[in-house]
Amino acid sequence: MKVLQILPELDSGGVERGTLEVAARLVDDGHESLVISNGGRLVAALENAGSRHIQMPVHRKALASLAEIPRLRKLFAKEKPDIIHVRSRLPAWLTWSAWKSMDRRTRPRFVTTVHGFYSVNAYSAVMTRGEAVIAVSQSVRDYILTNYPQTDPAKIRVIHRGVDERVYPTGFTPANDWLAVWNAAHPGLEKRIPLLMPGRLTRWKGQPDFIRLIARLIALGQPVHGLIVGEPHPKKLAFLAEIKALAESLGVIGHLTFLGHRSDLREIMAISEIVYSLSTDPEAFGRVSLEALALGKPVIAYDHGGVAEQLRPIFPQGLVKLGDLESAIDLTGKILKGRARPLSIKDFTLARMLDSTLAVYRTVLTRPR
């Protein structure tokens, strides 16, 4: 089986990581893996794992991108993949436009993955045009059927994103060298209780609620310290200044550390007592929360979207009503006192995700054209 995955770029993020994971599994199983993107820092890792990469500007939202359609059609005819798997809207439009003009009897099978709650319009509808459509959560499946009711429910397969338990083992402890560097960079933190808020710095991710939570816990006498991991989009740097001003106004700027982008989030989660997901809009999935649960860390999250789907079978006591900060504060105290721990992530493993994805490929290949 030859599988061609297409996405805008290979820099960082859940879509990109999932692409590399599927590619590596294909190679390990003896299949041929090819990825088209505009490139990025993950290309080397992709190629080192045995896949081929073809760089094309499939990321540009411009009229010039239409020139890629005949190039893609020519490439599909040359490479003859069995499966084309697209993971983003612009590449999906370019791919679909090239694919639909090919001979129906011999063209590759067309698979899409809906990774998020896209704005509802004709542009986003292309993600439902796959001969098989993968939804990364039940919430995303519901979004598809609610907003694109013409989509055949039978062709949608829910495949939750998965975590590699070898990389995120329960009870993981950072290396001594890492701990030494961390403690030197953050003196005195070992005397506090670290609480972690990971995620891109943007309003809907919930950092303001986390800062208010830290302020209330400090007022209640809890010796906590908030760790905020993530950076804002370059065009939204004002939000970082805004939440720092909020921390100043609440008198807790000294009880927070803004860590920016980190490549050692696993280690930071491991030394944190609780990890938070306080997004005011539902997450399509929320992979970082699952990684924390895999490490055995309690997660406190608002009860909606893909994160709630993870917590219900693994750590249901970590769910609080959307916006109910008082309940999140009370729950924090109870967890710190009782040291509750999540159950196994057995239904959300990387192996299960990859098995299910390859099963979709095999199934769509057997369907009538």
Regions found by a protein language model. Give the residues of each.
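Acidic donor-binding loop of glycosyltransferase active sites
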Residues: A270-A284
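Conserved acidic donor-binding segment of nucleotide-sugar-dependent glycosyltransferases
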Residues: P313-E326, G333-K337
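A conserved mid-protein helix/loop that constitutes part of the nucleotide-sugar donor-binding site
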Residues: G13-E21, I193, R200-R216, A238
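Short, structured helix-loop element that forms part of the nucleotide-activated donor/catalytic region
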Residues: R41-E47, L227-I253
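A conserved, positively charged/aromatic
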Residues: K100, R104-Q138, Q150
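Short hydrophobic beta-strand element within catalytic cores of glycosyltransferases
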Residues: V35, P298-A301
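Active-site donor-binding acidic/aromatic loop of nucleotide-activated sugar
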Residues: K235-L240, I253-R262, I268, L319
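Short His-centered aromatic/hydrophobic patch
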Residues: V86-A92, V114
